[in-house]
Amino acid sequence: MLTLDHLAIVAPDLAAGVAYVRDCLGLTMPEGGRHREMGTRNHLLRLGEALFLEVIAIDPEAAAPPHARWFGLSDPGRVRADWESGRRLRGLVARTDDLDRLLGAHGERFGKAARMTRGALTWRFAVRPDGAWPEDGALPCPMMWGEGPHPAAAMPDLGCRLAGL
């Protein structure tokens, strides 16, 4: 079973993404961190005990990975075109407790599991070989958190909640 984990805004750069959320919601998103495996960086906004909004972009200070970046970020021209056309909320990420089973049944749509870390946080994330969103964002990116509580529980609570989708 898949459960909504987070919503992803893919930005041409972090400053633009954070400014967009500030303009829409009137608050500044706290910094998340860097993803060494993907050469990306994010800001995160808690939306509930196990739900958050992410702004993600290429980290200009990181080395480019030897593989495609997640969320379609290996194609900066497409990211920029999507951004300029108003396509900001690019997709959803859904968690599962059995990523291997899901990918065994539907790997052609979602790709393969990649191990990720950010500080003490660990997770596995399905990434297509080209790094693109499954079905151009019509399907969520599946993932599975490592041991411990959901990371949203440790994020600052700025009072934002997702009322519906």
Feature-to-residue mapping (PLM):
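Donor-sugar nucleotide-binding helix/loop cap in glycosyltransferases
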Residues: D59, H67-G72
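Active-site-proximal cofactor/substrate-binding loop regions of enzyme domains
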Residues: M1-V55, P60-A64
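Vicinal oxygen chelate
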Residues: G33, L44-R46, L51-A57, S74-E84, ...
